[in-house]
Amino acid sequence: MATISDAEALSKLNFEFNGGDKRPVSEIIKCLNSNNECVAVATLMNEVIGFGCAQSFKSFCYNEAYGEITEMYVKKSARRNGVATSLISFLENQLHSRGVKSIKILTGRDNNSAIKVYELSGYVMDDEVMLMKELE
């Protein structure tokens, strides 16, 4: 699991991943300390080379909690070495310990390398459609 000492590295990796404004380290620390989010990091020689995030949800509509892997990023130089697969497995175990029985992952329809990793980890595509609306 990520710790506050990983916050600076997470800020840099998130910027590589999402672009836009770099997330302040103080905000990352606040999230790590108070959120329902599981944040996993992968390291190589004491350097954070990837991260994955997951959340669990419980609704009165369903008997069991469900989870979602919301973010997954591995530095380009560290890809194709099983890092993402290890992060997925770790997050699955964390969610399972919270009582989660099923996990969703959302990724871009053209992100073929990510889709392949998820499928190799046992995930299957379904026919759901995601809709989004920006609120002002």
What are these regions (language model features)?
Residues F57, K75, R79, G108:
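Residue-level recognition of the GNAT/N-acetyltransferase active site
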Residues T85, K101, R109-D127, M132-K133:
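Conserved active-site alpha-helix within GNAT-family acetyltransferase domains
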Residues E71-V74, R80-N93, K116-L120:
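Conserved acetyl-CoA-binding loop-helix of GNAT-fold acetyltransferases
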Residues I4-E64, T70, M125, E134:
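Acetyl-CoA-dependent GNAT
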Residues A2, M72-V74, T107:
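Hydrophobic adenine-recognition pocket in adenosine-nucleotide-binding enzymes
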Residues I88, L95-T107:
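Conserved GNAT acetyl-CoA-binding A-motif
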